């Protein structure tokens, strides 16, 4: 794919959910294609270690796209074909935190990223 601009920037916008169950995302930014970002999702209001957790995303003007899921104990992980081999989902149950390591980012990864239980 060719781009007319010298720089193509990628944006991972993050939104927190305000309710009894809280999932607060952080770590988005603007990067060049091919670079990396790590998103975090701090969970509270439920027993984090008992639930599988997902990342989903919504690109501008498009519907929700499932990205990845990790089992309650981190032993099983599954990915959408569009991110397989580039993104890695992980969790730290001692910190009630979910992560998404995003490598080799592409323009088409630009989206709002959400974590979900």
Swiss-Prot record:
Disulfide bonds: 41-115
SUPFAM superfamilies in the cross-refs: Immunoglobulin
Subcellular location: Secreted; Cell membrane
One GO location term (cellular component): extracellular space
Positions of region (Framework-3): 78-115
Domain Ig-like: 20-117
Region spans: Framework-2: 53-69
Signal peptide (from-to): 1-19
UniProt KW keywords: Adaptive immunity, Cell membrane, Disulfide bond, Immunity, Immunoglobulin, Immunoglobulin domain, Membrane, Pyrrolidone carboxylic acid, Secreted, Signal
Region (Complementarity-determining-1): 45-52
Pfam families: V-set
Residues with the Pyrrolidone carboxylic acid modification: 20
InterPro entries in UniProt: Ig-like_dom, Ig-like_dom_sf, Ig-like_fold, Ig_V-set, IgHV
SMART domains the record matches: IGv
Ranges for region Framework-1: 20-44
One of the protein's GO biological processes: immune response
Complementarity-determining-3 as annotated region, ranges: 116-117
Region described as Complementarity-determining-2: spans on this chain: 70-77
GO molecular function: antigen binding
Subunit structure: Immunoglobulins are composed of two identical heavy chains and two identical light chains; disulfide-linked.
Protein role: V region of the variable domain of immunoglobulin heavy chains that participates in the antigen recognition. Immunoglobulins, also known as antibodies, are membrane-bound or secreted glycoproteins produced by B lymphocytes. In the recognition phase of humoral immunity, the membrane-bound immunoglobulins serve as receptors which, upon binding of a specific antigen, trigger the clonal expansion and differentiation of B lymphocytes into immunoglobulins-secreting plasma cells.
This protein's name: Immunoglobulin heavy variable 3-30
Organism this protein belongs to: Homo sapiens (Human)
Lineage: Eukaryota, Metazoa, Chordata, Craniata, Vertebrata
């Amino acid at each position: 794919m060719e781009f007319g601009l010298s720089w193509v920037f990628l944006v991972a916008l993050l939104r927190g959910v305000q309710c009894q169950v809280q999932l607060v995302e952080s770590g988005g930014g603007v990067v060049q294609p091919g670079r990396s970002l790590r998103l975090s999702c701090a969970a509270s209001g439920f027993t984090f270690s008992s639930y599988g957790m997902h990342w989903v995303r919504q690109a501008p003007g498009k519907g929700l796209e499932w990205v990845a899921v990790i089992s309650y104990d981190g032993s099983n992980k599954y990915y959408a074909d569009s991110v397989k081999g580039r993104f890695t989902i992980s969790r730290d149950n001692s910190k009630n935190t979910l992560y998404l390591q995003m490598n080799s980012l592409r323009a088409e990864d630009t989206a709002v990223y959400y974590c979900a239980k």
